[in-house]
């Protein structure tokens, strides 16, 4: 069993590191080219994570990348590494089910799709309601 602090690391880098000036706070979508590029870099074991972090800074200073593209790249880079690590030892399942908030599950779904995995997304709120309803019916029926 593995778990990852990907979201925590992204938040720390975005809010408390030298990169905070190079990263936009607004959300980007999973189809953003910089996000897709970041995921692909994350899948590659040839680019170390710390090198990628420096590239975010360098892209901002030298290429004048916009902060939204930098945030999308960094998010994709971190998610790409997480997905690569997570699926490395998993058999190819028929389908991976993602449960959670819409914007985050879309990012994971895109990364998993790029890793050639079939994905189905489920809204977390709906499943919690269904689970609580089933528990109530079990207890009080």
What are these regions (language model features)?
Residues 1-42:
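Glycine-rich phosphate-binding loop plus the immediately following alpha-helix
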Residues 2-4, 115-125:
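Short hydrophobic/aromatic-enriched beta-strand-loop microsegments
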Residues 4, 8, 48, 70-81, ...:
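Conserved active-site and cofactor/substrate-binding residues in soluble primary-metabolism enzymes
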Residues 14, 77, 81, 120-141:
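Glycine-rich phosphate-binding/hydrolytic loop that grips phosphoryl groups
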Residues 42-85:
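Adenine-nucleotide phosphate-binding core of ATP-dependent small-molecule kinases
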Residues 87-93:
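Non-transmembrane, aqueous-exposed alpha-helical and coiled segments at domain scale
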Residues 93-111:
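Glycine-rich phosphate-binding loops at beta-strand->alpha-helix junctions
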């Amino acid at each position: 069993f593995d778990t990852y602090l990907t979201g925590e690391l992204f938040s720390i880098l975005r809010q408390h590191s030298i990169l905070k000036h190079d990263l936009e706070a607004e959300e980007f979508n999973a189809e953003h080219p910089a996000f897709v590029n970041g995921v692909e870099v994350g899948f590659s074991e040839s680019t170390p994570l710390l090198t990628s972090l420096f590239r975010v800074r360098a892209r901002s200073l030298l290429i004048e990348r916009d902060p939204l593209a930098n945030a999308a790249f960094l998010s994709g880079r971190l998610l790409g590494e997480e997905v690569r690590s997570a699926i490395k030892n998993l058999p190819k399942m028929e389908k991976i089910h993602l449960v959670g908030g819409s914007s985050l599950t879309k990012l994971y779904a895109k990364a998993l799709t790029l890793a050639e995995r079939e994905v189905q997304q489920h809204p977390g709120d709906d499943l919690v309601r269904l689970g609580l309803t089933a528990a109530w019916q079990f207890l009080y029926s």
